[in-house]
Amino acid sequence: MKALLSILTMVFCLSLSGQQYLTRQGTLTFDAGSPLEDIRATSNSATAVYDGKDGKLGVQVLMTSFEFRRALMQEHFNENYVESEVYPKAVFKGEFKDDRAIGTLDIHGVSQDVNVPATLVKENDAVRLKASFAVTIEDFGVAIPRAVANKIDPQAKITVDCTLQAR
């Protein structure tokens, strides 16, 4: 009986470690504000997938899904900065390993290798992914006009908070 219980426990643990997780309602925020201007936006429709078997992790967000406190900011963001008609989404592809998200981040058609602190915590039948890091806006080919350069922080702070459900 003990042997059977041990085998069932091992099989159950192995099935959890090989589980795939998904959300289409992840939260991503960015803050590129300065003392002169509050420039923050949030998207609650990020897609994230995680494979518990091999640690593969992917996150993507439509640029038009970011909501600003003022409609004009949102319009300028999509038309003048990220050019969301040409570059509709930001995508991270990589893996979760040793409390790090390691991979490639593609924004505005430019890919950069990233290695950022992240947590992945099991919560019932889900896992919660959290990360907070900064990116240099110009590293992704997004030009900041001189006329507004003092209003925009060249380092955008990105926060990721996604609860992924088992598939």
Residue positions per predicted region:
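Bacterial N-terminal signal peptides
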Residues: S6-S15
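Low-complexity, acidic/polar, glycine-enriched regions of mature
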Residues: G18-R167
